[in-house]
Structure formats: C-alpha cells, structure tokens
Curated annotation (Swiss-Prot):
Location(s) in or outside the cell: Cell inner membrane
Protein name, entry field: Phosphatidylglycerol--prolipoprotein diacylglyceryl transferase
GO molecular function: phosphatidylglycerol-prolipoprotein diacylglyceryl transferase activity
Family under the similarity heading: Belongs to the Lgt family.
Gene Ontology biological-process entries: lipoprotein biosynthetic process
Organism classification: Bacteria, Pseudomonadati, Pseudomonadota, Betaproteobacteria, Burkholderiales
GO cellular component: plasma membrane
Principal place of residence: membrane
UniProt topology in membrane: Multi-pass membrane protein
Domain of life (superkingdom): Bacteria
EC number: 2.5.1.145
Biological role: Catalyzes the transfer of the diacylglyceryl group from phosphatidylglycerol to the sulfhydryl group of the N-terminal cysteine of a prolipoprotein, the first step in the formation of mature lipoproteins.
A Pfam cross-reference name: LGT
Transmembrane regions: 17-37, 63-83, 95-115, 182-202, 209-229, 243-263
Amino acid sequence: MLMYPHIDPIALQIGPLAIHWYGLTYLAAFGLFMFLGTRRLRHEPYASLTGAQAWTRKDVEDILFLGVLGVVVGGRLGYCLFYKPGYYLSHPLEIFYIWQGGMSFHGGLLGVIASMVWFARSRHRPWLQVADFVAPCVPTGLAAGRVGNFINGELWGRFCDPSLPWGMVFPQSGSMLPRHPSQVYQFLMEGLLLFVLLWLYARRERRQGEVAAAFLVGYGCFRFIAEYFREPDAFLGILSLGMSMGQWLCVPMIVAGVLLWVWARRQPAR
C-alpha cells in the first residue's frame, strides 16, 4: 500500500506569477501534438498530396489552435450538459466560470470534431482526412492530462483490496483506505497504449475514416474499462445497469467507431 505523495500544484513561483504543474502538462500536450503532427506529415496519404491539397506545418499549427478552442468550449459545455444540466440551467452565468473546474472529455471530443469539420471546410478537404490525421496525435495529450490529474490529487479511484501492492491512500478523498490510482491506469491505457496502437496502425495508408474509427473504439473501450476502477462523480454515483456516466458516454462513442470502421472498410482503397 502506498501513500499519495503530496505534490505542490505550483511548479514555480516568480513573484506574483505562479506556474502550475497542470498548466505545464497542457503545454507538454500542445508540444507533443506539434511534434507528432509534424512527423505525421511524412505518412501517407499526406506526404504525397500536392498543390492546394498539400499538408504543411502551418496546417498542424492551425489544427492545434482550433483543437484547443474545441476542447475548452466543448469540454466545458459537455460537462454542464452531461453532468449538471439542472444546476447550470438555473445558473447559466456559471457556465463561464471555468476556473472553478468541470470539463468533460466527451464534450471536448465533440468540440474538436466541430473544429475539425470547420478546418476541413475552410481548406476544402474531406473532414475524415483531417480526423485521420489528428487521431494518432491525441493520446499523448490525454496522457499528459492524466499526469496533471495525479499531481493535483484528483479523480482518484475506487477502494481496492488493502493487499494490492500499488493501492494508494489519497488523504484528500476524506478516507485513509487504499484506492486504485485510476489516473495512472488511464495514463497507461488511454495515453501510452492507445498512442502506440494508433501510431502503428496509422503508419500504413488506410481507407479514409479507419484511423479515426480506431481512435473512437480504442479510447471508448479503454475508458469504459478504466471507469470500473475510477470513483464515480459524487453527485451522480452509479447510474442504471451499474454503469457510470463516463461509461454511458463511451457506449455511443464505441458504436459510432464500429459503424465508421465498417463503412470505411467498404470504401475503395485510395
């Protein structure tokens, strides 16, 4: 059994300026996206596109900018609508109180999809081509986010058997019983493992939509599994069929991914 190592959320204090670890994890996520996106330009079909359809570093920068907007706006609206709709309908101005916390991955995903559709239309490119480009670059950002969750001592797991060697006590949870370090589980599954699988899968030229579909199915399945070890939101608890809100939101994600993959496989090879 391990004790959560209290980590000061402020990485560096320079006078009145406080640099938080969580902010640094976001910075790392953006940097990793730029690095991987630049590498992705060498993969087919992007490497062989020419003229107006050619992909450049400027495209990667624009996608990152739009993606950040999609994550912030979609993530916040998703949290308000999926997790506390009644409260935020009664207190609509608090939707803008982002500093109070409350972001949803699934809402952020919808925001990113919307921003990618806009990017594709503005560049006169198939939006699935854009989605396939982005998908393998996302998991490292998710991994960085889970590091931030762990440093902040938030989103801890459910109670575990005291004999579990890596069971961890999170004093901030209000209990001294060991829990699953679910942030670490999600870092490994939704971050590192999903990245390796998607990156290897995307190295070969695929039918349009296949890589994006693999991301939807892969993330949905890994998140669904991780939710069994993660403490549900206190104000929601466990919902019908013994599933958490996160699991219920993963179901349509997995179904959409499977349908997209089946559709993509039926398209002629490029």
